[in-house]
């Protein structure tokens, strides 16, 4: 069977309900925490390290929920939501590869913010470069990622780590 290499919003919503990779396996969060509108490219090879690559997008419009509360009179998308989107994509990649378990963000190395996402922006692009997938008792994905707004790179994160757990009881 040929793997799908792009996903539209409806398919990402199916993933948030546990319907894309099967029960008990990787899920994306549901709206409002789903920070993606589409995955335009996902592959097992490619990226900076030749271990896989994802490119995803979020359409920006002024009525997104976070602009009302962060901050009143000075609306900006919280940087932590861009970071979370990168973790979401690393977990999505692990599920897409067919690995079992529920995803949990496990940390990252250095994160740099050099810009902001404002309500008048058009599109956010996430670019994930998989560095390693460890498949032992724990499935662990490690990646570097960037966030760009309207073509300008504004966040960088290295060593994004996401694990897949078949049981989260002792997590």
Swiss-Prot record:
SUPFAM superfamilies with a match to the protein in the record: Thioesterase/thiol ester dehydrase-isomerase
Domain of life: Bacteria
One GO MF term: trans-2-decenoyl-acyl-carrier-protein isomerase activity
Pathway of action: Lipid metabolism; fatty acid biosynthesis
UniProt keyword annotations, A-Z: Cytoplasm, Fatty acid biosynthesis, Fatty acid metabolism, Isomerase, Lipid biosynthesis, Lipid metabolism, Lyase
Gene Ontology biological process terms in this record: unsaturated fatty acid biosynthetic process
E.C. number(s) listed in UniProt: 4.2.1.59, 5.3.3.14
Record GO cellular component, one term: cytoplasm
Protein name in the entry: 3-hydroxydecanoyl-[acyl-carrier-protein] dehydratase
Gene behind this protein: fabA
